[in-house]
């Protein structure tokens, strides 16, 4: 066992003395057992994590029953909703790398034999997953579960996005202060990851397809007794995974990655999933290119439409309809789309996991013969505005905006854009451009939920597009095109755009262009001053110096001194 490094032999007497002092060692026989890290992310700032302390307790109890010695430790976490619209959002994506590094540090420093990872919200799941693949010791994931959708006294279904959009409605006088307060009070009824197919739930669903989590991980509600049982089962499974030395890189193959992307496209997951899955693939040293996504999307039908694409369906409805296993089972009917032979943490193949799944509600999970669209709910656009690509959640775009051409309304920061939108400077037909908000420019590639919600709340969702080198919340809807690469801070073409330039978006044609000649773009770029970093000290300054482009997952580049020669 790896943990023998810190517990076996007379030389390790000091180590054992310290371990005993933790109160976790119950006797000498514990030194013969695997040491299992319970990698929790409990904190009281994130509603999706406020209940995880109890799940950690259950995991420790079950690991000990199964023959292991549990050691719980925590990672940090950022609530994207609370961090939204201010400097805090610049720390959100950057926290993914901190989480990965911290999990790596604890597991390696203490020679843990395996991990039970308990994430839930946006950057915590991919951060833990990146660490798992980096250290490559047996790991199983079990998330905290989704929040229930809210309901107003009148019976209207609401969620967090309803509140953001209600702010825009309040700014126009469409709703009263009292109506806004009613939505605010009822949108988030309890703990759990926000209730739609936003980033957190998207990643927890993808964990099933990747093979790292048990069936049900993505959809069983936080308050459901089945969630506690899922934690118990996962905590028992880790002992078997350790004994058989089944490691993350044994599970995550290129085929498993393609399975996850197919699921992502079929359920219209958050655009952030592409960013995170590319980063995960990088840690696994898998050869996968951003440009491959459109080919897979073209053969994957969009069969499960969930909030924010529609307010009629939330994650709890997907669970009642059969969950992720039912979606995968439906997709398995398409010859060659899924590789059902890939292994999973259940000890069975993906095909064995889903063979008995069935769709229980065709209004929630459609058949492959009757999809919302024949192609997936996410795609990549290319053109002279985004030579290295840009991402859009097609499943949340209204029909009138699938093709759009209009004058650019350019803002060099999210704050300026919000002020412009709320101040009435954006009109029907415009293309709002928010730049210098990419991985380096932001820094941290902040999400644009506030401006997109303002556009929707002001009734412009069917007539205004938004383009950015930043990101979007999984809760954004409308013609929201993000991850524009290269970003403005490295003098990508988006930096050349000027107010009034015509921008043309053709989503079915997968293109995004500005009606400016290549020569004019080059001249404008040549005349730009050098980008001045917005933050010059602390973690974000270091992050901005090392982060790479969105089309490679916004991972941190390896310092030159660490590169193999």
UniProtKB/Swiss-Prot annotation:
Catalytic activity: (2R)-2,3-dihydroxy-3-methylbutanoate = 3-methyl-2-oxobutanoate + H2O; (2R,3R)-2,3-dihydroxy-3-methylpentanoate = (S)-3-methyl-2-oxopentanoate + H2O
Pathway membership: Amino-acid biosynthesis; L-isoleucine biosynthesis; L-isoleucine from 2-oxobutanoate: step 3/4; Amino-acid biosynthesis; L-valine biosynthesis; L-valine from pyruvate: step 3/4
Binding sites annotated in the UniProt record for [2Fe-2S] cluster: 121, 194
SUPFAM superfamilies: IlvD/EDD N-terminal domain-like, LeuD/IlvD-like
CC terms in the record's Gene Ontology section: cytosol
EC class name: lyase
Active site: 473
N6-carboxylysine PTM positions: 123
Assigned keywords, A-Z: 2Fe-2S, Amino-acid biosynthesis, Branched-chain amino acid biosynthesis, Iron, Iron-sulfur, Lyase, Magnesium, Metal-binding
Gene3D superfamilies tied to this protein: IlvD/EDD C-terminal domain-like
Co-factor remark: Binds 1 [2Fe-2S] cluster per subunit. This cluster acts as a Lewis acid cofactor.
EC number: 4.2.1.9
Cofactor(s) the protein needs: [2Fe-2S] cluster; Mg(2+)
GO biological process, one term: isoleucine biosynthetic process
Ligand binding (Mg(2+)): 80, 122-123, 447
GO terms of molecular function: 2 iron, 2 sulfur cluster binding; dihydroxy-acid dehydratase activity; magnesium ion binding
Record's function text: Functions in the biosynthesis of branched-chain amino acids. Catalyzes the dehydration of (2R,3R)-2,3-dihydroxy-3-methylpentanoate (2,3-dihydroxy-3-methylvalerate) into 2-oxo-3-methylpentanoate (2-oxo-3-methylvalerate) and of (2R)-2,3-dihydroxy-3-methylbutanoate (2,3-dihydroxyisovalerate) into 2-oxo-3-methylbutanoate (2-oxoisovalerate), the penultimate precursor to L-isoleucine and L-valine, respectively.
Family: Belongs to the IlvD/Edd family.
Quaternary structure and partners: Homodimer.
Name of the protein in question: Dihydroxy-acid dehydratase
Provenance organism: Chlorobium luteolum (strain DSM 273 / BCRC 81028 / 2530) (Pelodictyon luteolum)
The gene coding this protein: ilvD
